[in-house]
Amino acid sequence: MKWRSTTVVCVRRNDSVVMISDGQVTYGNTILKGNAKKVRKMGDGNVLAGFAGSVADAMALFDRFEAKYREWGGNLLKAAVELAKDWRTDRVLRRLEAMLLVADKKYTFIVSGTGEVIQPEDDIASIGSGSPYAIAAGKALLRHTDLSAKEIALEAIKIASEICIYTNDNFTIEEL
């Protein structure tokens, strides 16, 4: 059996940064939980972080990321790069099956176990199985509306939850 993913979306607009996720945990073809919290604030409330993938793996990565963030004096880019380097080279970490989406007031990054640290071109980023749908909806709303970051993030993940069977409509929202 395989753990299935989720959807986490981050939207930036004006001075607002919003991260939202669904709450579904799926194992094989069974929904185990519908209200999991997959986004949280860290770094004294200055960073938003969300995960897709194995919960235990993501918790380990959250802890390591927060340690790197503190080690590098609140430098989000340096913390993300250093975590990605460790993740790629450490034998134990390499086996972790998760992705992180992290953001502060200045940057948004997707961090993967293959050593990737990706800064999205637009003001929206997403990870997980519903990402393509959320990104498409979010980009359209960013381009053609004056909605707030929170409204765009919420609508983007709602649309993803209507299409992706591994994404439900029980959302957790964090905002900077």
UniProtKB/Swiss-Prot annotation:
Active site: 6
CC annotations in GO: HslUV protease complex; proteasome core complex
Lineage top rank: taxon: Bacteria
Activity modulation notes: Allosterically activated by HslU binding.
GO-annotated molecular function: metal ion binding; threonine-type endopeptidase activity
EC number: 3.4.25.2
Single GO BP term: proteolysis involved in protein catabolic process
Alphabetical UniProt keywords: Allosteric enzyme, Cytoplasm, Hydrolase, Metal-binding, Protease, Sodium, Stress response, Threonine protease
Record-linked InterPro entries: ATP-dep_Prtase_HsIV_su, Ntn_hydrolases_N, Proteasome_sua/b, Proteasome_suB-type
CDD domains listed in its UniProt record: protease_HslV (cd01913)
Predominant place of localization: cytoplasm
Reactions performed catalytically: ATP-dependent cleavage of peptide bonds with broad specificity
Compartment list: Cytoplasm
Binding site for Na(+): 161, 164, 167
UniProt KW Iron keyword: no
Pfam families referenced in this protein's UniProt entry, alphabetically: Proteasome
Assembly, per entry: A double ring-shaped homohexamer of HslV is capped on each side by a ring-shaped HslU homohexamer. The assembly of the HslU/HslV complex is dependent on binding of ATP.
Known role: Protease subunit of a proteasome-like degradation complex believed to be a general protein degrading machinery.
Protein family per UniProt: Belongs to the peptidase T1B family. HslV subfamily.
NCBIfam families: ATP_dep_HslV, PRK05456.1
Record-given protein name: ATP-dependent protease subunit HslV
Gene source species: Thermosipho africanus (strain TCF52B)
Gene of this entry: hslV
